[in-house]
Amino acid sequence: MRKGHVLLGLAVLTTAVRGAAAQTPQLPLNTLNEVSAALRACWVPPPLDQSRAGMQITVQMSFRRNGELFGHPRITFESAGASDDERLAYRVAVAKMIKRCAPLPFSNALGNALAGRPFTIRLIDHRKLREAGNVP
């Protein structure tokens, strides 16, 4: 396995989701932008005491035509300088995001176009930066 690429284990993906403030998409998704927006709506960053200001994490995954996850998601980037505990907290948050959202409600056209192809999304935790007034 190459440096910077971490496979999310099945144990992390089956982590229980409790009290999620995120929304699961309801309407059929027709575009890649809608897929990104749906995944971001399902993402809940780690608690502030486990987070890092400006933390970025990128995950690559593939879907089946019906919106189910195909294979295992892979972390392809994490902010430099994050501690192992911070990285783990964000990996768990990504796994919970996927668990909340999957399967995604793809339209037939989007499902046919996206099936089996890599889909990458970057998530950025701006919460502490917003509090400091550094992000709009």
Give the positions of each predicted feature.
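A short, highly charged nucleic-acid-interacting micro-segment common to nuclease
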Residues: 22-28
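Conserved "boundary/linchpin" sites in short secondary-structure elements
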Residues: 23, 36-44, 60, 64-81, ...
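Short loop/turn motifs at secondary-structure junctions and domain boundaries
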Residues: 49-54
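N-terminal signal peptide c-region/cleavage motif recognized by signal peptidases
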Residues: 16-19
